[in-house]
């Protein structure tokens, strides 16, 4: 699969709410996942598929998602960008918010070698 194919499929899965399935399908074993902030007070950088999976499990356990909009993908070479807008409630605060996030994905051998997330205000 080329970058466009991977990007299109990842977006399709995310639009269906299948974020964990998208990760399992496309993360490289040594994927590096970088958040703008440290999730749950942990490290903002997760290294390896198990760590990325754990970060996702923590996120799902600590947030209630009411709806998701997914835009993209926007492809350039071995990279692509996807924008996510999530209507969600962090369980700790109980305050419903809209999170605006952009993911930059870099592929190597058809797998996500790095994902880097940026947040809007």
Question: What kind of region is each of these model predictions?
Answer:
Residues 5, 20, 24-77:
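A solvent-exposed, acidic/Ser-Thr-rich amphipathic alpha-helical stretch
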Residues 13-14, 73:
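Hydrophobic side-chain positions on well-ordered alpha-helices
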Residues 6-13:
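Solvent-exposed, amphipathic alpha-helical segments
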Residues 12, 41-45, 94:
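Alpha-helix initiation/capping motif
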Residues 2, 53, 57-121:
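A beta-strand edge to alpha-helix "cap/lid" segment located at domain peripheries
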């Amino acid at each position: 699969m080329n970058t466009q194919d991977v990007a299109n499929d990842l977006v399709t899965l995310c639009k269906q709410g299948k974020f964990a399935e998208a990760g399992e399908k496309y993360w490289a074993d040594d994927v590096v996942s970088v958040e703008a902030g440290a999730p749950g007070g942990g490290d903002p950088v997760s290294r390896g598929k198990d760590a990325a999976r754990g970060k996702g499990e923590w996120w799902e356990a600590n947030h209630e998602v009411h709806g998701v909009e997914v835009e993209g993908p926007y492809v350039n070479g071995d990279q692509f960008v996807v924008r996510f807008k999530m209507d969600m409630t962090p369980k700790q605060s109980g305050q419903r918010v809209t999170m605006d996030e952009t993911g930059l994905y870099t592929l190597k051998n058809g797998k996500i070698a790095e994902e880097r997330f940026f947040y809007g205000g």
